[in-house]
Design a protein with these regions (language model features):
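Short, solvent-exposed amphipathic alpha-helical segments in soluble enzyme
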Residues: 301, 376-379, 406
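Surface segments flanking catalytic/ligand-binding clefts of nucleic-acid enzymes
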Residues: 417
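Helical hairpin unit composed of two closely spaced alpha helices linked by a short loop
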Residues: 366-387, 392, 397-399
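Catalytic-core elements of nucleic-acid end-processing and repair enzymes
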Residues: 429
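Thr-Gly-centered strand-to-loop micro-motif
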Residues: 362-364, 421, 440-441
């Protein structure tokens, strides 16, 4: 009985109940007005008409436009008011204003070093054009950076611990999910030891992905050991579109000289200490050298987002050494955000797919591409490019898995090869293209990751590590089962119905 009460009155349930109360209040208010005043109904219809014109002419992704237009059409009384309520809240406006302000204030600190840009131009005009796009959005391209690839989360974690123990100046940590367990306990033990030694430690976690900090003793422990903590966008039971904008990034910066990034969060399933969906396949990279500066700045931009007037001494966090030997090439870390027109994640993926000559190999846990990405993948395959995608065989979300099958059939009909990782769940987010280009980071092939979340990734060109990534992809493919058109046709009728209905909600999943 105690367990039942605990589940009924835990934090998540209280949030859901408060949200439902707000929705019920809005619905009842509108219905009451509509029954008693004919002019209210007329005003709502006029409002809906104006909103339809506004949404149709906005710069938003067409899929999101269609989703809202359907809501307004199906719910003429409630739909328009819902849009206004969600999009005009003051907290949402302040949220995006603060981010834009931070980006403008720090732009002079992320200027392009001329030699790297010139060398890239001489090497490849096509890649230079993509790089220039990222430069214009505030993310330079670098040389003098070594890249190490980790095919599994446990291998990355072992190296992270080694590097953390050597920290001398500062440690910046930014993760979507941090959960109690072996991984976090070992991580925290090292942070406390380094903080005692005088190392500056800052930790930022997402307010939705990581909730246990608010209920446990961690914040008290952190304060005792001089570990600075910040919750990004605390989750509140309010109807606000800003609650969708989560910090999905995974960043660890050590002394400004080393940065880790990839798909792994700080929880036991990511290092296969806890089995949830079979074997957990994740990937990550470690950067050493000049390119670490971009990850340092990405962290500080979000850290100072709620305190835009803070005078941060940014230059003290610059790299203090460059590796004498690297595995060559050009490295360009970049961040993505839900701010309007900031769609670097989509644009980079589209460019890689559209300009591929021989092959595009993709790993993603969620395959819910928007229309542009779906079209680009199909066109590439129809042009003769070898397009392969590996997704999980054991999904973590049943509804996302059902949606993936919507894309499967359309892609297979165009010649795209699809594989499911048979041992379990693949959480990696990576592209490998033509032996020359690669992207690895936190950006999934779904709407939330591409348009709603704060994300980050690294573009890699002409670097020896790409061959290591390619070999790991092919090794993973050998452990995966191919999906065929026959598999799509043989699905149960109710599975197909689920996929079609869920397709209406794809932008929200």
């Amino acid at each position: 009985m105690k367990k039942i009460w605990k589940h009924l009155f835990n934090q998540n349930m209280l949030y859901i109940l408060l949200m439902l109360v707000q929705i019920a209040f809005l619905v009842l208010s509108v219905l009451f007005l509509n029954r008693n005043y004919a002019w209210v109904y007329g005003a709502l219809l006029l409002l809906n008409g104006l909103l339809i014109i506004y949404i149709t002419n906005s710069r938003k992704n067409p899929t999101y436009k269609n989703a809202w237009l359907v809501v307004i059409a199906v719910l003429p009384i409630f739909g328009g008011l819902s849009y206004l309520f969600l999009k005009t809240r003051r907290d949402t406006r302040i949220f995006f204003h603060n981010y834009k302000q931070q980006m403008e204030q720090t732009k002079p600190l992320l200027t392009q070093e001329p030699d790297a840009a010139r060398h890239l131009f001489n090497d490849s005009q096509q890649v230079y054009n993509l790089s220039t796009y990222l430069q214009h959005t505030g993310f330079p391209v670098y040389e003098q950076t070594n890249v190490t690839y980790f095919p599994l989360g446990e291998e990355q974690f072992a190296e992270m611990k080694n590097r953390l123990r050597e920290a001398k100046r500062f440690i910046f940590i930014e993760y979507f999910i941090i959960a109690p367990g072996k991984m976090w306990n070992e991580f925290l033990e090292i942070l406390i030891e380094r903080a005692r030694a005088g190392v500056e430690v800052r930790l930022m976690y997402d307010g939705f992905g990581t909730k246990f900090f608010s209920t446990g003793d961690f914040l008290k422990i952190a304060k005792q050991h001089h570990i600075q903590c910040q919750c990004f966008n605390p989750f509140r039971p309010l109807l606000s579109s800003a609650q969708n904008n989560r910090d999905h990034r995974k960043i660890l910066v050590i002394d400004g000289n080393i940065a880790f990034n990839g798909g792994t969060n700080l929880a036991d399933e990511y290092i296969n200490e806890k089995v949830r969906f079979g074997h957990w396949k994740d990937t990550a990279i470690m950067l050493e050298g000049a390119a670490v500066w971009s990850y340092t700045m990405m962290f500080l931009q979000l850290w100072n987002m709620n305190n835009p007037n803070k005078k941060e001494a940014y230059d003290q966090y610059r790299p203090t050494y460059l590796p004498k030997q690297t595995n060559g090439g050009f490295i360009q870390p970049y961040g993505d955000s839900p701010v309007q027109d900031d769609v670097k994640g989509v644009m980079v993926y589209l460019d890689l797919i559209s300009n591929a000559k021989r092959y595009v190999y993709i790993e993603t846990p969620y395959l819910i591409p928007d229309h542009d990405l779906l079209t680009a993948l199909k066109l590439a395959a129809e042009k003769g490019v070898d397009v392969r995608i590996i997704t999980p065989h054991i999904p973590d979300k049943w509804y996302v898995y059902q949606l993936a099958w919507n894309a499967y059939q359309e892609l297979l009909e165009s010649g795209v090869k699809i594989f499911e990782y048979t041992p379990g769940f693949i959480h990696a987010k990576s592209f490998v293209v033509d032996d020359e280009l690669a992207v690895l980071g936190t950006i999934n092939l779904d709407y939330r990751s591409l348009y709603l979340h704060f994300e980050c990734a690294t573009l890699i060109y002409h670097c020896n590590v790409i061959q290591t990534m390619l070999a790991d992809f092919l090794k993973t493919q050998r452990k995966s089962q191919p999906i065929t058109l026959e598999d799509c046709k043989n699905r149960k009728w109710y599975q197909k119905c689920n996929s079609y209905v869920l397709g209406l909600l794809a932008p929200l999943l």
